[in-house]
A protein has these predicted regions:
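Short, glycine/charged-enriched secondary-structure capping and boundary segments
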Residues: 1, 28-31, 95-96
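A short glycine-rich, Lys/Arg-flanked "PGG" loop and its adjoining helix->strand segment in the class I
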Residues: 1-12
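Class I S-adenosyl-L-methionine
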Residues: 48-55, 86-100
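C-terminal and late-domain segments of enzyme folds
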Residues: 83-84, 104
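Short alpha-helix
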Residues: 58-81
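Conserved class I S-adenosyl-L-methionine
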Residues: 12-43
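Core SAM-dependent methyltransferase catalytic element
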Residues: 74-77, 94-115
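Positions that flank functional sites
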Residues: 21-22, 85-87
Length: 115
């Protein structure tokens, strides 16, 4: 609600995040649960440059649908979604990925909502 009050009338709210339901979200939640990236469950699946483990442990993870529901409940409307990191995490450093519309496949998602 504080963010909505801070926006001018017809303002735009932008959220960029790793969705809980994405491959990256699952990987980071597992690393948080086991306390390290250096765990047999994560061998061979980690990207070369993961987020710092401290960020994974400190993060509060939510699904994109949860975020949309909260924004709608706050009165936001006219949503746009963009995503990237569509490859499995261990392959993300091989090529630059373009941003594409949507949110169901990306490991990093932008939600754009209007007041």
């Amino acid at each position: 609600d504080v963010c909505k009050k801070a926006l001018k009338p017809n303002g735009t709210f932008i959220s960029l995040d790793v969705p809980k339901e994405s491959a990256f979200g699952f990987m980071y939640l597992l690393a948080k649960e086991v306390g390290t990236f250096d765990h047999p469950f994560l061998n061979g699946v980690m990207p070369k440059l993961p987020y710092p483990h401290e960020l994974c442990c400190a993060g509060v993870w939510h699904s994109t649908e949860e975020k949309i529901d909260v924004l709608k409940a706050l009165g936001f409307h006219d949503f746009d979604f963009y995503q990237t990191l569509l490859k499995n995490p261990m392959y993300t450093n091989e090529d630059v990925e373009d941003v594409v519309p949507g949110y169901q496949s990306g490991g990093y998602v932008a939600i754009i909502a209007h007041k």
